């Protein structure tokens, strides 16, 4: 093995394979780009993003950890969201939850 080398198993790595995803349409109504990271509580994203926020309660983007989705002004995109798991406690972001989701 070479120092720093990674050896991966065979086949594809599936993210969130065991989680049910929903698809929503999101429009950036603002005049600036908005970037949303993989672990951000989607319900609390920038208010310039227009979508049915009730559907996003307790959910995050269905993308690999550390990735993000960028919405340019006027962009309309469909994104997949999955539930937060574990204790389902959310703190920070825009301070709209600060506790248990359920």
Curated annotation (Swiss-Prot):
Species of the source: Clostridium perfringens
Enzyme Commission number(s): 3.5.1.5
InterPro entries in the cross-refs: Urease_beta-like (IPR002019), Urease_betasu_sf (IPR036461), Urease_subunit (IPR050069)
Chief location of this protein within or outside the cell: cytoplasm
Subunit structure: Heterotrimer of UreA (gamma), UreB (beta) and UreC (alpha) subunits. Three heterotrimers associate to form the active enzyme.
Cellular localization per UniProt: Cytoplasm
PANTHER family according to UniProt: UREASE
GO molecular function: urease activity
Domain of life: Bacteria
Any one Pfam family match given in the protein's UniProt record, by short name: Urease_beta
Catalytic activity reported: urea + 2 H2O + H(+) = hydrogencarbonate + 2 NH4(+)
Record protein name field: Urease subunit beta
Family of the protein in this entry: Belongs to the urease beta subunit family.
Keywords assigned: Cytoplasm, Hydrolase, Plasmid
Pathway linked to the protein: Nitrogen metabolism; urea degradation; CO(2) and NH(3) from urea (urease route): step 1/1
Keyword Zinc-finger: no
UniProt record, GO biological process: urea catabolic process
Cellular component aspect of the GO annotation: urease complex
Disulfide partners: none
């Amino acid at each position: 093995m070479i120092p720093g080398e990674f050896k991966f198993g065979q086949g594809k790595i599936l993210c969130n394979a065991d989680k049910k995803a929903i698809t929503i349409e999101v429009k950036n109504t603002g005049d600036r780009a908005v970037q949303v990271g993989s672990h951000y509580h989607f319900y609390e994203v920038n208010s310039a993003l227009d979508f049915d926020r009730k559907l996003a309660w307790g959910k995050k983007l269905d993308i690999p950890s550390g990735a993000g989705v960028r919405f340019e002004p006027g962009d309309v995109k469909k994104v997949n969201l999955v539930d937060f798991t574990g204790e389902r406690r959310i703190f920070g972001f825009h301070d709209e939850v600060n506790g248990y989701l359920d």
